[in-house]
Amino acid sequence: MPASLKATLRGYQVDGYQWLGSLEHLGLGGILADDMGLGKTLQMIAHILARVEAGDTKPTLVVCPASLVYNWTAELERFAPSLDVCAIVGAKAQRRVQIAGADEHNVVVTSYDLMRRDIDEYAEQDFARVVLDEAQYIKNPLTQVAHAAKRLPAGVRFALTGTPIENRLSELWSIFDFLMPGLLGSRESFAKRFESPVEHAEGDSAARLQTLVSPFVLRRVKEDVVADLPEKIEDTVMAQLTGEQRKLYLANQDRIAQQVQHREASEFKKDKLKVLAELTKLRQICCDPRLHYEDYKAGSAKLDTCMELVHGALDGGHRILLFSQFTGMLDIISKRLAKEDIAFLKLTGASSKESRAKMVAQFQAGEVPVFLISLKAGGVGLNLTAADVVIHYDPWWNVAAQDQATDRAHRIGQQHTVTVYKLIAKDTIEERIMQMQESKRDLVNSVLGGDGISSALFTREDVLALLGGDGR
């Protein structure tokens, strides 16, 4: 263990630290895929610090989501203050100078987007190791970010992610194509040998793939390694649409169902994006029709139900994280909270890195009782253990994204039981999304132990199932 590390690692974290060291000693990379909240960042910091104390002179490059750049620098300062750390941000000219001087630091940290823009400069450097945090950012091998990441020069490469597979096996291939190109073959051969057979549950393909990747993937879940983590209680709260809201929902549902029914499978595939946009409209009506109809004046059953949960939690002395994938819904909730004199913070993709850090500090210090967060902007990387109530206002296609958001509160450092409320509009597409999440978990479980569905994988029959059977 590095002498200057300012932390005491738990047993499983020591195992992870030693695993990283063993891989690097062999010149190999790997995926640290621990459950959210188990300290992947700390394990990697300990590994980097150990290499520096052993005489490593080349820098480490950490690439992470923009919202986590300052989180990484803060954690490095906290746990390894002896390391020289530089955040590569700011204007292009400033970044160019910082990258050219990367070897003056032990660790340099930047975001995926800036790494993509600056890849030509990074390609001229020589890093001891490259670490991709939230490595699902390169899950699509066709993106510019994925292409750029695979050009980064390094002795070894590591990936940190709680969800190495969110929706399909090709995501795992893309991460391994970054770590150790060729290990899983070409993308085409991987699809033929593993992806298609596993997704269709053919033969022993899942077991063979697990055998192939298991030496390079370390995944622990909280239930297995943290005996003292407080309980997590999950509760689905149904809201019954009534009146004008229900009329709008049924009218739109029937219209979309007729459109899909009259499309052939080939037409559906071509128009899938349009259909998914229509499904989003249905989901917005479930949340609050004002998301789609500016002149809508009637109420929202879900918003009323949500406010009942908020008041009940606050009356009990609890503190709340409230997630929605729709920033417009967070705006509507903000107005309702302000009207009822409830103090709150709001984090979206428009929030600056500095304001994110400030809001997290305020919430953790107990200054504000409610934190509204967009699922995409704040679902990963944040430590918000001051909350013991989590409300998911709307269900996302990929349940893993919701689980990641929940684990902002249910993680190491949490002292209280965490209650998670999933708000669902009864007899609507939302209820069927939940059912589909449950029915499509098996794919990832068979390889790594995870879950998720993808709207991109929807068939015509899936969409009709989402639209069909709604009670009237």
Feature annotation, model-predicted:
Residues 1-202, 210-472:
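ASCE P-loop NTPase motor core, strongest for the SF2 helicase catalytic module
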